[in-house]
């Protein structure tokens, strides 16, 4: 008889334990031992077993487990199983982090990461193949709207694989906070039907009380040109600003504006001319809300970077020129204050549309979902890249399914209160999909292409580059443990299938936009994996965390505009408030922004996941080094922000979530 000591860890979330007995088997290279119904898993507990096995199993390869159905059937969340005894080299660790359901038999392989080519005796081949076959049946590609990158199949969150659903603590927090915000909306919103905005200060009625000082600062300074320009550098959407290489062709300067032309050319020559072009919105059909037409424009903003780092607007053009029509009106800082303010408000509303749809939803949420589904379909749990990426997929599929069903669905939030709802938002997403280049997801390339490297007042650029470098070093160190040469990368068939699954299937053939169809070297692999992790963490955080800060004061980021853009510069405050959202629309914007933009109480910061997918000290040391570098960056940002008038925190590692969860 051979003695084994087994330690089974159950999750500590509500309902993670089970009333059912669990059947266990030990699988070794010389045979398999049935341990019988040995275990009743308890919430948050580690259950210890000592068993005698009548045969020598040799090297321990796997643990199989199956939950026995009783009178009361309940799922069980198994974290991991640890085995001590012969063939374990002291101790063998079997990561699980999965729900055990029904009578399904789950096979947990030992946590040492292995590529196909490492398994020279084919000991794990059948486990890899069976796991991927099962996963491809469970994780199927779906289709939401034609021309958009692919989601997970499933109409509602109940259709998702159990392992991708919210744990009970997350589910309760999400549901209760949503009920709270909707209750407040219902109570206070009834008064909005009898109230009308008479002046800009009336939006104070819906201005929320927040835990940070920035919304109040925005409310007090939103009219200032410096704050208007600052938002393109470090606001909720820092993804549109780029340095001008030439004057845009659409910028038609009519006679009498020679001085403006001279100023623009001077800044262009000095390398201090920047632009934000919203042409993606041109021709988008605007929404009709409660039988009232809403309006959308496609502005162009030209800005100059001052020696002190301030970015100031020089010219605003609200619409592109049309053939056979007079040149569109240009707005200048020297115009009457109300005309200039209304032009800036139109820009802020346009920025709201592209921020929420292109930068946040598409580039953050939907891109992370493509990566997660492709990984689940292509890489078995033994694979080192699966183990590296798995912590960054937590809750992404469910939050995206909820967004498709409630935010951008028919009669969802966009249809109810946003100027691009009722189809325009889908048009924008389809157009933006064609702009998804590989370089734009890698900050060193993206920031270089947009001319933002070295711009000291772009705190987003500085922090994005720093975070990318830390993530890249983490990936490189981990890859070096398992890929000794470029040949190892090229000859890894599962890795190549995964890369093609992302680019050709999930991204609908994005190889023409620079995404790789294959990975030919360690450098290419590291860049691709770093892109995946940054997308699921920093990329999303940079466009998510600022929502409440910058949109709490409605005139600074209106979700819709109720009047067409001005055709003259004879503008009054009445014209402005009649253009901005009514109080009902404004309150709904605040309700959604508060709910989605709040700091999450159930949150795992970047690199702080507790799941251990790797076994052995070397991967653990690499993760520890990653955490140490993140802590240094976090502290340095804290020190920097203490001396800043406007602190920038959206890429602070302690605030960046480890995955897209909200």
Swiss-Prot record:
Pathway of action: Lipid metabolism; hydroperoxy eicosatetraenoic acid biosynthesis
Reported tissue expression: Expressed in epidermis.
GO cellular component annotations of the record: cytoplasm
Cofactor: Fe cation
Ranges of residues in domain Lipoxygenase: 115-662
Single GO MF descriptor: linoleate 13S-lipoxygenase activity
Catalytic activity of the protein: (5Z,8Z,11Z,14Z)-eicosatetraenoate + O2 = (12S)-hydroperoxy-(5Z,8Z,10E,14Z)-eicosatetraenoate; 1-O-methyl-(9Z,12Z)-octadecadienoate + O2 = 1-O-methyl-(13S)-hydroperoxy-(9Z,11E)-octadecadienoate; (8Z,11Z,14Z)-eicosatrienoate + O2 = (12S)-hydroperoxy-(8Z,10E,14Z)-eicosatrienoate; (5Z,8Z,11Z)-eicosatrienoate + O2 = (12S)-hydroperoxy-(5Z,8Z,10E)-eicosatrienoate
Outcome (variant: residue 260 to L): In strain: FVB/N
EC number: 1.13.11.-, 1.13.11.31
SMART domains recorded: LH2
Effect of residue 617 to S: In strain: FVB/N
Gene3D superfamilies: 3.10.450.60, Lipoxygenase-1, Domain 5, PLAT/LH2 domain
Subcellular localization: Cytoplasm
Stored CDD domains: PLAT_LOX
InterPro entries associated with the record: LipOase (IPR000907), LipOase_C (IPR013819), LipOase_C_sf (IPR036226), LipOase_CS (IPR020834), LipOase_Fe_BS (IPR020833), LipOase_mml (IPR001885), PLAT/LH2_dom (IPR001024), PLAT/LH2_dom_sf (IPR036392)
GO BP terms: arachidonate metabolic process; lipid oxidation; lipoxygenase pathway
The family this protein is said to belong to: Belongs to the lipoxygenase family.
Name of the protein this chain belongs to: Polyunsaturated fatty acid (12S)/(13S)-lipoxygenase, epidermal-type
Source organism (scientific name): Mus musculus (Mouse)
Gene name in the database record: Alox12e
